[in-house]
Regions:
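Conserved N-terminal alpha-helix of the aminotransferase class I/II PLP-enzyme fold
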Residues: 5-54
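Short N-terminal signal/transit or membrane-insertion segments
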Residues: 21-30, 36, 140-155, 168, ...
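Short N-terminal secondary-structure initiator segments
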Residues: 31-45, 166, 171-183, 196, ...
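A generic structural signal for short, non-catalytic loop/turn and secondary-structure boundary residues
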Residues: 40-41, 195, 212, 342-344
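A short, charged/proline- and glycine-enriched loop
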Residues: 43, 66-67, 343-346
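Conserved PLP-enzyme active-site core in the AAT-like
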Residues: 50-65, 69-292, 334, 338, ...
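Conserved PLP-binding catalytic core of the aspartate aminotransferase-like
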Residues: 274-362
C-alpha cells in the first residue's frame, strides 16, 4: 500500500521492445537521452542507473588505457581512482588541493595550474612526454565538492586545456550551474569550444541537487569539436565502457526520473525554478545572520561596501561576488587561490558553529 500498485507495474523487463533497449540506446530511451543532451548543452547524454560512482568508472574506462597520463585532483572521488588508476591503469599526476582551518575541503591551488609546474611533475614520471605539446590524456577535476567549493570552469579550460585530450568534470554535487546566469563560467558545457580545445565530459548526480531518484546519474559528453582527431572517443568505444558498467536488468523508474529531470530544467521554466531556489537560499542565510547568535553562514562579511545581509536579494541572485572566494579572505581562510577561480555553492547552506572565528580564520 505504501508504494502503490504502479510502482510494481512500472518495474518492467528489459526485453520490452516498446520501451527500447537501454544498453544500446534505442526507442524511448534514446529520445530521452537526446532531449537531455539538448537541455544540458551537450552532444550526447548517457543515463546512468548506478550513481556517479558508476558514471565515473564508465568515463575513465572509455578514455584511459594503461600508461596514459591523467592530471588528477587530490580530492577526486574514489570511483575516479578506481576507474582511472586501477581498472584503466593510468598514471596519475597529482595536483595539490586546499583545506582551510575549519576543516573544509577546497580546490586545486593556483600554482598547480601553471604549465611549467605541470610539465615539471610530468617529467618526474615521463621526461619524453613532458616535452610533448599535449602530454595528458585527461584531467579530472571536481567541479563542485562536498564542502561547496565550485570551480570557474572557464579558467580551468583556459589554463590547462591545451595540455589535455579531455577534461572530465565530476559535477556530482552541482549540475545546476548552467541554469543560473551568474554561474555561467562555472559550466564547462556553456563554453565555446574550438578544435584545439579539450573534449569535455561532465558527470552529474541527478539524485543530489536535481530531481532524480537515488542512484540517478548522467554523463554529458561535449566533444564534437574534436571529432575526426585521433584523440576523439567515438560512441562505440564509449558505449562499450557504458555496457561493462551497467546492468542488464535496469530500473525503469530511475531512468524515468532522469527524463523528467531534463524536462523540469528545460527552457525558461528551469531558470525560473533555480532563481526561486537561490532567492530562498539567500533569504535563509539572511535570517540566520539576523537572528542566530551562535551560528553563521559561510559568506563574505562585506560585499560592495555593505554587509552581506544588507544586499538586495534579487541583485544578489545575479551577482557571483556574494559567493566568491576572494584571495586572502579571512572568512574562508583558503590559501593559494587566484581571483575569480572559486565560488561557494549558493545552494549549499553551510553554518559555522561557535568557536570558529571567521573574522580571523581561526
Amino acid at each position: 500500500d505504501f508504494y502503490g500498485e504502479n510502482t510494481f507495474r512500472g518495474d518492467l523487463c528489459n526485453a520490452d521492445v516498446a520501451m527500447g533497449d537501454l544498453l544500446i540506446h534505442e526507442g524511448a530511451a534514446l529520445a530521452a537521452q537526446k532531449h537531455a543532451a539538448r537541455v544540458f548543452n551537450a552532444d550526447k547524454a548517457y543515463f546512468i542507473l548506478n550513481g556517479t560512482s558508476g558514471a565515473n568508472k564508465v568515463v575513465m574506462n572509455a578514455l584511459l588505457t594503461p600508461g596514459d597520463l591523467v592530471l588528477y585532483e587530490r580530492n577526486n572521488h574514489k570511483s575516479v581512482g578506481y576507474g582511472a588508476l586501477i581498472q584503466a591503469g593510468a598514471i596519475p599526476i597529482y595536483l595539490e588541493t586546499a583545506r582551510n582551518p575549519f576543516g573544509l575541503i577546497g580546490g586545486v591551488l593556483d600554482h598547480c595550474f601553471n604549465e611549467e609546474y605541470i610539465r615539471m611533475l610530468i617529467a618526474e614520471r615521463d621526461p619524453r612526454r613532458a616535452r610533448m605539446d599535449r602530454p595528458l590524456r585527461a584531467a579530472v577535476i571536481q567541479l563542485g565538492n562536498y564542502d561547496g567549493c565550485i570551480y570557474n570552469a572557464r579558467q580551468v579550460v583556459e589554463k590547462i586545456g591545451h595540455l589535455c585530450d579531455y577534461i572530465v568534470f565530476d559535477s556530482a554535487w552541482v549540475g545546476y550551474e548552467q541554469f543560473i546566469p551568474m554561474m555561467k563560467d562555472c559550466s564547462p558545457l556553456l563554453l565555446d569550444l574550438k578544435p584545439d580545445d579539450p573534449g569535455i565530459i561532465v558527470t552529474q548526480s541527478i539524485h543530489k541537487q536535481q530531481a532524480g531518484f537515488s542512484q540517478a546519474s548522467q554523463i554529458l559528453k561535449k566533444d564534437s569539436h574534436i571529432k575526426g582527431q585521433p584523440r576523439y572517443v567515438p560512441h562505440k568505444i564509449f558505449n562499450n565502457a557504458f555496457m561493462v558498467n551497467s546492468s542488464t536488468s535496469p530500473n525503469y523508474q530511475i531512468f524515468a526520473s532522469l527524463d523528467m529531470n531534463a524536462k523540469m530544467q528545460e527552457g525558461d521554466a528551469g531558470k525560473m525554478l533555480w532563481h526561486e531556489c537561490i532567492v530562498n537560499a539567500i533569504e535563509a542565510r539572511k535570517k540566520v545572520l539576523r537572528h542566530c547568535r551562535y551560528l553563521r553562514p559561510i559568506v563574505p562579511p562585506v560585499v560592495h561596501g555593505k554587509k552581506w545581509e544588507e544586499g538586495d536579494t534579487e541583485q544578489m541572485a545575479e551577482d557571483i561576488a556574494y559567493f566568491a572566494f576572494e584571495p586572502g579572505g579571512k572568512w574562508h581562510s583558503f590559501q593559494g587561490y587566484a581571483k575569480g577561480h572559486y565560488f561557494n555553492a549558493p545552494m549549499k547552506l553551510q553554518l559555522m558553529p561557535p568557536g570558529s572565528q571567521m573574522e580571523t580564520g581561526e
